[in-house]
Amino acid sequence: MPSSIEFRSYSEHDDYLAEGKPEPSIRSQTLIYHSGNSKWWIKVTFKGELHGLEQRTPKRERRREFQNFVKHIDYSSLPLLDDTVTEVLLEELSEPHHAALTLRETEELASSPFASLARTLAYTMREDPSRVVYPSCREFQSFPQINMAELSDEVMITAGVFKVFNVQNKAPYILKVVNRPLYYPYDTEVIRRELEVLEICKGVPNIVQAAGIAVSTNPYMTSSASDQPLVVFGILLQFHSGGSLKEALSEGRLLDHPWERWAAQIATALAHLHGAGITHMDIKSSNVVLDSDGNTILIDISGIGGVTYEWCAPEIRDEISPIALPFEVRRLCDVWAYGRLLSEIVSRAEDSPVSRRLRQIADCLTEENTRSRMTLLEAISQLEDVGIGTLCGTCN
């Protein structure tokens, strides 16, 4: 059976733009090499510049030229790695070398801008460090497994997050995939951590619950045999039909819901995380959704997925890596962000004894001085009294 290649993504380092150079110094083409009943994922990376290039060419032209070159590489001569992505690093060497590329000689190659470099290129190989890493299902055996083939009708909610349906029972889920746009290897650790936190928070009210893990065979699998081990393609979460709290607030639908109980629901959910030694670090209205009864559900609970600057407490806004701060500092940030969220909710409410009380609590939670900032447990205690007419005490 003849071999073939299937082009996938092309990328370039764009530092050359700031440096005023006519071309990138690093460019990569990912492809799938098919031979017989096997396939290998390969990323060919060229480090260097074409000789004599003075004017900048369009990116699509550079991609076409590089693709024309890499399709002439004899991949059968390379020691490709199975079940992963092999990166073939190409660099020009001025001295003779042993790791020379084997190329198919054609007129097309002879006319390629890479022709003058072809015989001076040395290659090294490694497992691509930027490949998408899919966790093994064996890491998360406590979660129900649903094969991707059983899911359909993907509707994108945001980057890497979809609403899907089970083809058998039509149950809706939220699917968070591992291979999100602009993927970095750290994204896999975020997925792993979220699954760990979901296990810890199983059955806890007002915290998103896992429906299972979406599984598939390893996309990088070399063999076409059917009995391949499964990997985690993504997280399946329970779907809630009420939309996000951010949408409810921006669309003026606050009074359509039992909004007075939201403050206590979010606070107790956050307190449960803190009690388990977990911080959220991205409390905001878009990370709270509403169920069919108008109750709040806290989502994105990995605690390491990133922060939103304007929702960070003042004392950590200049930190390069807020996620790496000590637990107590992160906990105080969560408390401040919760106070800001409470303030945002109250700002959409009509004036009443309850809204005035909640506004006072929000002010205490967002104190810039961390020593005088109200604690979450103090806020919960105050919230238990909302509606009975007692005013919130002053911050101290």
Per-range role (PLM):
Residues 134, 144-200, 205-208:
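ATP-binding glycine-rich loop module of kinase domains
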Residues 367-379:
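A conserved short helix/loop substructure at the end of the activation segment
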Residues 270-291:
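Catalytic-loop of the protein kinase fold
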Residues 292-364:
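C-lobe/activation-segment region of protein kinase-like
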Residues 392-396:
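Regulatory extensions appended to serine/threonine kinase catalytic cores
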Residues 262-263:
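Activation segment signature within eukaryotic-like protein kinase domains
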Residues 209-256:
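Conserved structural core of kinase catalytic domains
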Residues 2-20, 41, 48-155:
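Juxta-kinase regulatory segment immediately upstream of eukaryotic protein kinase catalytic domains
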